[in-house]
């Protein structure tokens, strides 16, 4: 099965959706079959690859509520090797519809195996929150990539995200790893960007990608044309940054990729989507998160080592 990477940060405006779109497109540009899964009700990923959520036959919403299998929601894009499962405004109410379901945090992980076999990578754009949709994404993922803007208060709230990852590991997905921390919106003209980069590297160490995504006009313009940066202007700094990130991820995952290719049908990683041995308690990880929320707020700048990353 292809590797599932969730792009997550509950803070808005950190480059999460930009990273999801352009990482997926860059992986596709290296001829690795990639599925971009938009689980954010804002559907910016969907429009960012040239799709109108109102015009698609099915979206991730229908998948989550059990109306269609995931394979029927897949839409091809203009870019070879890149497909998408679009989002829809109806997804806003999905968490309410899912709340009474048994093992509600595992709905996405149960739906994905049939499509994971067709791809080398699945990139999930999570909502800017730590609600049920994000929990489903983390439960379904092999790893999580955390974008962090190179601006003041960059580390604010990360303790809560790391605590969520820790709880998901304990209750739902023990194999969840940190793919890496990505510095975004880096402005080479500002000393502040360098200071933030040093601070992030001090807290996260080797988990910080060597690649840094710089502020770039073309990167900001591309979504309004419904294109990833690599299709909008491949020579732009933003497109080059995300190609460098894709290469870094491919290098870090070489063993996984070779295993995936060797087994042909994608049986590598099968255990990541296996059925749990026992049903989760009724409150599940959601209850554990509520209990630990105040604790996480106090630890918002806790070093990554405390979370065994």
Predicted segments — roles?
Residues 1-309:
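P-loop NTP-binding core
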């Amino acid at each position: 099965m292809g590797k599932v990477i969730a792009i997550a940060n509950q803070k808005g405006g950190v480059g999460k959706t930009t990273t999801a779109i352009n990482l997926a497109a860059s992986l596709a540009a290296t001829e690795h079959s990639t599925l971009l899964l938009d689980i954010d009700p804002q559907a910016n990923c969907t429009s960012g690859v040239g799709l109108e959520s109102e015009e698609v036959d099915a979206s991730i919403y229908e998948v989550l509520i059990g109306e269609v299998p995931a394979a029927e929601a897949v839409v091809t894009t203009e870019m070879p090797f890149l497909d998408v499962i679009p989002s829809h405004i109806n997804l806003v109410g999905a968490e309410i519809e899912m709340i009474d379901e048994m093992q509600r945090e595992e709905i996405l992980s149960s739906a994905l195996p049939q499509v994971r076999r067709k791809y080398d990578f699945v990139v999930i754009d999570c909502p800017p929150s730590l609600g049920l949709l994000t929990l489903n994404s983390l439960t379904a993922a092999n790893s999580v990539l955390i974008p962090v803007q190179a601006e003041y208060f960059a580390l604010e709230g990360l303790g809560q995200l790391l605590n969520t990852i820790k709880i998901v590991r304990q209750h739902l997905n023990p194999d969840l790893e940190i793919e890496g921390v990505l510095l975004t919106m880096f402005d080479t003209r500002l000393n502040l960007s360098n200071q933030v980069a040093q601070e992030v590297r001090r807290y996260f160490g080797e988990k910080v990608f060597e690649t840094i995504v710089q502020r770039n006009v073309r990167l900001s313009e591309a979504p309004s044309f419904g294109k990833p940066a690599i299709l909008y202007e491949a020579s732009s700094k933003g497109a080059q940054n995300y190609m460098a990130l894709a290469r870094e991820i491919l290098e870090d995952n070489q063993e996984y990729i070779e295993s995936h290719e060797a087994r042909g049908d994608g049986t590598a990683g099968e255990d990541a989507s296996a059925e749990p041995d026992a049903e989760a308690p009724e409150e599940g990880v959601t209850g554990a998160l509520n209990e630990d929320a105040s604790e996480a707020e106090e630890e918002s700048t806790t070093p990554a080592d405390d979370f065994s990353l």
